[in-house]
């Protein structure tokens, strides 16, 4: 636990699943009100971070995650395997994202775990380059060894994303090639290296409410809390085992954002995949409930994202300052 967490009575690391579920199951208006109070006590409500996400190495992943279009196990998703992007190309994308208003640049590689060598060295150069632009840098590369986490920390990495996906009791129905303990070990290596943890999960995969809140309980009981918690709604991709799942009720996203905010008061709650399916009003309700970050740009790895100009207009409409330049203009 950090010194800041010790001095804040709202920070806890002893939640039970039943306690977290009792919060999640509150009447929705009461839940949003409570989450909003916690949010305003710990954050500027007009500060909604824009992060940009780029797939720097796409497809061919040996993992069998049931939701993922990049798994080599799912042959009919239409995602072709590609090599790692050149460093210079990635940094051009980062510069365009910064010009469009993003303050964090996230890079994802479809690996089970990175191998030491030229590709990992290139990722380190990308991290250094993004930091040199004055942006926060986040990567998601799969499982890490402690020495790899230390090298990323030395390169200046702000945060490492490694999602738990769901609660521990439902996890093996989604993934069989990587255990829950594997994921927790990588998160510990990241913490030990002094890198911020970005960790959340996905709803809409057939799990129950208890599985959702169990995931939040695991995260909230880590010390320190993750610096950011992505809340994703399943983007059902044809050709994956979960490709026929129905869409998530928007109120379920609101509940997850609000619950995450209450049990992890200082974390950034990142409204992530599935946001494209939410109305403007549903997104604003998520912001009121404590979400204070979005992915800004046309794509989230291999799936479409909300139009960048529409995002800019929404943020302006609710009083959040954004640059006048659009993402499309920045890339030209």
Swiss-Prot record:
Phylogenetic placement of the source organism: Bacteria, Pseudomonadati, Pseudomonadota, Alphaproteobacteria, Hyphomicrobiales
Designated name of the protein: Biotin synthase
GO biological process: biotin biosynthetic process
Cofactor annotation: [4Fe-4S] cluster; [2Fe-2S] cluster
InterPro entries from the UniProt entry: Aldolase_TIM, BATS_dom, Biotin_synth/BioAB, Biotin_synthase, Elp3/MiaA/NifB-like_rSAM, rSAM
Pathway: Cofactor biosynthesis; biotin biosynthesis; biotin from 7,8-diaminononanoate: step 2/2
Enzyme class: transferase
Source organism per UniProt: Methylobacterium sp. (strain 4-46)
UniProt-listed PROSITE patterns: RADICAL_SAM
